[in-house]
Design a protein with these regions (language model features):
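The −1 position to Zn-ligating cysteines in a subset of zinc-ribbon hairpins
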Residues: 193-196, 200, 213
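Short Cys/His-rich "knuckle" micro-motifs
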Residues: 202-208
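Generic preference for hydrophobic/aromatic residues in regular secondary structure cores
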Residues: 63, 201-202
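Phosphate-binding loop of NTP-binding sites
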Residues: 1-196
Length: 213
């Protein structure tokens, strides 16, 4: 990684990409901090991961992260490499890791990386060719997230807050805003039916799409 900086390559992907090509289960063997927080979701994961990083750094913690933006397996591998010595053990100065993780990369990362906490910001339609429907992504996360991880979920998003129902969880939400509406005007709405009782959802207010209360 230092050599890449000297040659003016930022190295956000290449070291980890090479490591995974040489050893597909590289993440199994590389050292990791004792405490790991993962952030995933369709929108806002970079912002949330960076905010957590900044807050914890301001509190005096030494944080290992992939905040340069590469959130697939190669980027996560590079971030962990950055925190390890020559023998692959995590250097003792790192108190924890904040890792932004792409939703579709979950099956390749979570078998080897076991976060204490996983923040899921929301799940939306994104790239149809890659992500299909948000329910499809929710199913990937449900099957991939470590059972021991505590989830921090968006209570205003009925898709992401139902992920991995067997995991321990806490919820966050945002109070009603002046711009919220009582009727949804979006042509697309991926959550019309209650995921528990199958009845039609009645919203007190909506923020956009299926986000609301």
């Amino acid at each position: 990684i230092p050599a890449l900086k000297i040659t003016r390559h930022n190295g956000t992907d290449f070291p980890g990409s090479l490591a995974v090509k040489l050893c597909p289960d590289f993440l199994k063997y590389i050292g990791k901090p004792e405490h790991i927080i993962a952030v995933t979701g369709t929108n806002g994961k970079t912002t949330v991961a960076n905010m957590l990083n900044d807050v914890l750094t301001a509190e005096g913690k030494t944080v290992l992260s992939n905040r340069a933006g590469s959130n697939i397996i190669s980027g996560v591998s590079t971030a962990l490499l950055k925190g390890c010595g020559l023998l692959g053990r995590i250097r003792p100065e790192y108190d924890l890791a904040i890792l932004e993780i792409d939703e579709r990369s979950a099956p390749r990362i979570y078998p080897y990386v076991k976060p204490e906490h996983i923040v899921i910001t929301n799940l939306f339609r994104d790239s149809i060719m890659r992500n299909a429907h948000p329910g499809y992504i929710a199913d990937i996360l449900t099957r991939s997230l470590p059972k021991e991880s505590r989830l921090i979920l968006n209570a205003d998003d009925l898709i992401s807050c139902t992920v991995a129902p067997e995991n321990q969880r806490v919820y966050f939400g945002i109070d009603r805003l002046p711009t919220d509406v009582t009727e949804c005007e979006n042509l697309l709405n991926d959550m019309r039916i209650c995921p528990r009782c199958a009845g039609k959802l009645r919203y007190e207010y909506r923020r956009y799409h299926h986000i609301g209360r």
